Amino acid sequence: ENGLFVPLCAAFFAIAAAPAAGCVISYYISAGQEDYRRMKGETLRSGETGIPMGKALLILFAVSVVGISAILRANFYYMDDSPRAALGYKQWDYFSRYLSTALATLVHGGDYLVDAAPLPQMLAMLIMAVSGILMGYIFCERTTFSGWELAVLSILGLNPYFLGCVSFRFDAPYMAFSVLAAVVPLLYRNRNTAAYLLVSGLGILAVCTSYQAAAGIFPMLVVALALRMWNRGESIREVGLFCLKSAAGYALGLLFFKLVIMIPADTNYVGNALPSAGELIPHFLENLRSYYSLILSDFKPFWRIAAVLAAAAFCVRTVLDSRRRTLPAIAMTAVALILMGMMCFGLYPALASTVFAPRAMYGFGVLLTVFGMTAAEGKTRVPLKIPAVVLSWVFFVFSFTYGNALSVQKDYTDFRTRLVISDLQEVEAFRSDAPVTVQLSGSLGKEPVLWNMPQNYQMLNRLIPDTFGGGDDLTQYGFYCYYDLQNVVWNPDVDLREMDLPVLEDNMYHTIRGEGRYVLVELK
């Protein structure tokens, strides 16, 4: 009876809260529709022409899907895609990503995650397209868009760091949803304080329970909007009140997540603990420096030039359009630029053990989108639009390069895996039905042809994961689970590298050592 008490109480409160939740949702839907009708009327009265929001969404989604078509064609199992497809597990709860777990049940039609690719990845690009259109709607305050604006909005979903997210066959929609959850609260920034605080808190809570790497997007967009408000001539009090309400809603969501929902997590690559108070700021700045060092090495020279010019165009456009005096406008733009640059990676730089993988850095893609969206706004000052549009084009092209590289890596992995299996068949231990412990050592690395792409290699090197080797469960699932190896046993409790096993086979691709019921494969 005691075991049923908590679930029954939870069910009771969920049922009791349903009417209130319905009223809240109904209010926000009605408020959003009312604001849209008002904005559409203002757009018509202003004489602004362009692509309507609905058509703009379809265009942006189509461009995004075409952009990732090479990734979809590669049919690549990215990192933990292999074990998820083999075992159907979720396990996002370990990182307190309960919303991802719940949404995955809906997307995959049950608790067991079936491989439904490319549906999740296409859903992710639809969510990113919606996020981009909403960002344009929020910043430009109109319901039509120009071709320039749509071009730069494609950066949001096709920047190299988000490509590392959409590569996941299972995780992609929830990574994209974290961006949408950070954008939606800003639709209600002009509503009453209570409504804005609540939706901001809920939005940040949704970010933290889907993918925490997006935790810096909301405050970054708040800073960009505050700068626009100030440049339009709105009073310091109005701008300050907007920032204060946004900060309060953000803190509300973070505190609730930290105190009520979050569970401590610590893996071999990331944890959610913070350093001591005295070390927090130096640690944050050091990690921030590491993130930007990675960006400098990831981006080839032409990308870096285009990104810097896009940032410069953002600054110039902001100052030229400002109703304030030039020097204060320059100063405020510089402050906003620094703040956004510090916020775009969210809370990750503050973690004692953080992650520097490309998938954790897509906030920088949002920052580039903000730069481009500001520079491309309107029909004037065409030269300022060019850097961001060029950046959107090179990212579009790179998405095909990356997808093709995944395909090449997959073929190389299959080739090397089949060679190992073929040679194992000749080992005497496999001539009976008795189980044999087989371990992998070393790694095949990247496909040799990728080394011939010096301009793209560093970005590709970080985006393309290890696919076959020892020491990491994610690089071994394919070998142990996908080839129906009848009498092969995966036993991580014993380390065959410590045994002096005799060489049974040695060739240019691998060395096979073995004795009795133990076999070690050393990949070269």
Regions found by a protein language model. Give the residues of each.
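Membrane-embedded helix bundles of polyisoprenyl
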Residues: 147-166, 173-183, 200-204
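Start-transfer (signal-anchor) and selected internal transmembrane alpha helices
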Residues: 5-66
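Membrane-helix interface segments
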Residues: 116-118, 143-149, 192-198, 235, ...
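Alpha-helical transmembrane segments of multi-pass membrane proteins
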Residues: 126-129, 176-187, 200, 217, ...
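Transmembrane catalytic cores of multi-pass membrane glycosyltransferases
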Residues: 1, 5-6, 12, 16-19, ...
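Signature aromatic-anchored transmembrane alpha helix within multi-pass, membrane-resident enzymes
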Residues: 195, 377-400
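Membrane-interface transmembrane helices that cradle and orient dolichyl/undecaprenyl
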Residues: 182-197, 229-234
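Intrinsically disordered, polar/acidic, low-complexity terminal segments
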Residues: 43-94, 98, 104, 108-131, ...
